[in-house]
Amino acid sequence: MTQPVALLDANVFPTTWLLDILITLDEHEIVDVVWSERQHRDPERIDRFLDSIRSMNPTHCIYGWEPRETLLDELPDPDDRHVLAAALVADADYIVTYNLKDFPLEKLSRYSITAIHPDVFLCRMLDRDTRGVLDVMDTVVSNKNNPPRTMGEELAHLRKLRLNTFSDRLKSLYSE
């Protein structure tokens, strides 16, 4: 089964709890997570974290998107053209973003790329590979030591990140 490719918008990076899940999904080969170097420059507070994950797999950072950016004028915000350009170069299936309004469906449909809220994206991955996502969540929780966290605490925090459906579905699966 081919992994979907998901380009992460810059607004996903500051949320390290979400990013931890997405990177671990990638490590478990459930999804191929990518980003562009330009996105690294957006929120300064993520630099240390990005430095640690850059070495993980150099193919996660997409290069060579710059020439395409100038050809893309479909998006409402010109500052988001680089995101679409990088997604095209990566042959991404998804742009994972909290700002869906910046990536209108009618503008992306010609490229076969879907802008998707992180909650919906995680639910799709859960549908695609339930056991794999549960393993990822177990790994994420067991790796959190400072402070240690229970699955219940993790799920409660995911709700604060507007990952309500994903959190509810996980809670249901863990109660079975």
Positions of predicted regions on the chain:
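PIN-domain endoribonuclease scaffold, especially VapC-family toxins
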Residues: 34, 38-66, 140-162
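Acidic, metal-binding active-site segment of PIN/NYN-like and related structure-specific nucleases
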Residues: 83-113
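Acidic, PIN/NYN-like endoribonuclease modules and their adjacent C-terminal/linker elements
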Residues: 101-176
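PIN/NYN-family metal-dependent endoribonuclease catalytic core
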Residues: 16-44
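Active-site neighborhoods of divalent-metal-dependent phosphate/nucleic-acid chemistry enzymes
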Residues: 58-94, 128-129, 148, 159-176
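A generic structural signal for alpha->beta connector loops
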Residues: 30, 58-59, 112
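Metal-dependent nucleic-acid phosphoesterase active-site entry motif
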Residues: 1-20
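Short active-site oxyanion
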Residues: 4, 30-32, 91-94
